[in-house]
Amino acid sequence: MTKRALLSVSDKQGLTDFAKGLVALDYELISTGGTKKALEAADIPVIGIEEVTGFPEMLDGRVKTLHPKVHAGLLARRDLPAHMAQLKAAGIQPIDMVVVNLYPFKATIQQPDVTQAEAIEQIDIGGPSMLRSAAKNFAAVLPIVDPADYEQILADLQTDAVTPALRQRLAAKVFQHTAAYDALIAQYLTTEEFPEKLTLTYDKKQALRYGENSHQKAAFYENALPTHFSITGAKQIHGKELSYNNIKDADAALRMVSEYQQPAVVAMKHMNPCGVGLGTTIEAAWDKAYEADSISIFGGIIALNRPVDLATAEKMHALFLEIIIAPSFDDDAFAILAKKKNLRLMTVDFEQTHTADKFETISVGGGLLRQEVDAAFETPADFTVVTVTQPTPAQLKALAFGQQVVKHVKSNAVVVTTADRTLGIGSGQMNRIDSTKIAIGKAMKQAGYENAILASDAFFPMDDCVEYAAQHGIRAIVQPGGSIRDKDSIAMADRYGIAMVTTGVRHFRH
């Protein structure tokens, strides 16, 4: 019996060559709409779907293939005589292959100003139905959804090398594809922030050599609706491929540097900033970030919110760095940095910061945690002075900078800063006093310590942190407040005559 293949594709890539190969193998081709016209234009013999169903297309093409003569031909089990007898009695011929890719819903909703009505018209109904029918019956029907598979499938057909394993792989690919397609539609139509069913779909962006450690396998996936301002939306223009750890650190650095309005540089190591600097120029900001911790910056990830110029590039070129990510690189800056073949240079559109993710999701055993991104930002207008001593205008500026930095540091987090650079960062300690000692210990070695302030990501459970800070020259502190022992910390600050402000906003980061 002549084999039959049903072709209905929105992506015509490779279609005619594949169809010619099928005809050469004595396949009878069935097709619909634009696919049929494309085949006819290439002088490839094809019959219309209405000749199979005996029913014309209707509702502006919304109903074409939703017919028993199509789906019975796909779903009938060839190994069950009763199924084949029913086909014969109904005058239905089996269909042995389905070649379908779906309406371009994703491309449609990514167009600017697309209306919901336009998007809905690109929700494919018949295509997924045919693919799922074929994939369910993959033992007898080849379900093909990806033009990239045409060449290999044709070669296997020509050599009679279509294996059960290949059939199962193609079926799995179909169900992955249709599940992702439906998830994208659900994602588009859902207005709830935390729906009862969370349907997200991701596409494999790249394979990674390994994960966090060399014995761990890993890959990098991108949201099917990626944001322009993100590490996935960044463009790598030089250097070796990104690693798992590179991606995490670059993401953290990019999120942080995007919060600053004036020229800023963030140096990131192991998901913690090791140096942050602000300046009137990007070179000045670099100098401050570098001076903040010239040891830890070695092998770091650098994020800048201004184009990289030659002067800044020359200074960065003198160091071993993993990644530099910025809006752009001046030609002469790129030329000098590109001399390091392994240094990864990346660009991202800072005009698109408004598109950054509003939610973040992390995996836990057996599930996910989803929350709003911590976009809170406290300014001096949000501060409440709780001590007798009032902070000076200069201290208020420094407190605001410290508060903005500390929320990006792993808890327990304490930072010591001036108004435009970090001096010491204490991160990830199990108690706040240890973080305080680390931050102050680093800061005391820095120029400008006499103007330093201290910021804490959460309240002080006891007054020991305030006492230690005061004894080591800190003159102003910002912290959320809210401890049952706040009065003890405030009294300690008053005892030493230092200013303290509270924000009412905690910034834990795990």
UniProtKB/Swiss-Prot annotation:
Reactions performed catalytically: (6R)-10-formyltetrahydrofolate + 5-amino-1-(5-phospho-beta-D-ribosyl)imidazole-4-carboxamide = 5-formamido-1-(5-phospho-D-ribosyl)imidazole-4-carboxamide + (6S)-5,6,7,8-tetrahydrofolate; IMP + H2O = 5-formamido-1-(5-phospho-D-ribosyl)imidazole-4-carboxamide
Protein's UniProt name: Bifunctional purine biosynthesis protein PurH
Keyword Mitochondrion appears in the UniProt entry: no
Family: Belongs to the PurH family.
MF term (GO), any: phosphoribosylaminoimidazolecarboxamide formyltransferase activity
Lineage of source species: Bacteria, Bacillati, Bacillota, Bacilli, Lactobacillales
TM segment ranges: none
Top-rank taxon, per record: Bacteria
Enzyme Commission number(s) of this protein: 2.1.2.3, 3.5.4.10
PROSITE patterns: MGS
Biological process annotations from GO: 'de novo' IMP biosynthetic process
Alphabetized SUPFAM superfamilies for the sequence: Cytidine deaminase-like, Methylglyoxal synthase-like
Domain MGS-like per the UniProt entry, residue ranges: 1-145
InterPro entries reported for this sequence: AICAR_Tfase_dup_dom_sf, Cytidine_deaminase-like, MGS-like_dom, MGS-like_dom_sf, PurH-like
GO CC list: cytosol
Keywords: Hydrolase, Multifunctional enzyme, Purine biosynthesis, Transferase
Pathway terms, separated by semicolons: Purine metabolism; IMP biosynthesis via de novo pathway; 5-formamido-1-(5-phospho-D-ribosyl)imidazole-4-carboxamide from 5-amino-1-(5-phospho-D-ribosyl)imidazole-4-carboxamide (10-formyl THF route): step 1/1; Purine metabolism; IMP biosynthesis via de novo pathway; IMP from 5-formamido-1-(5-phospho-D-ribosyl)imidazole-4-carboxamide: step 1/1
Signal peptide span: none
Alphabetized Pfam families for the sequence: AICARFT_IMPCHas (PF01808), MGS (PF02142)
Domain notes: The IMP cyclohydrolase activity resides in the N-terminal region.
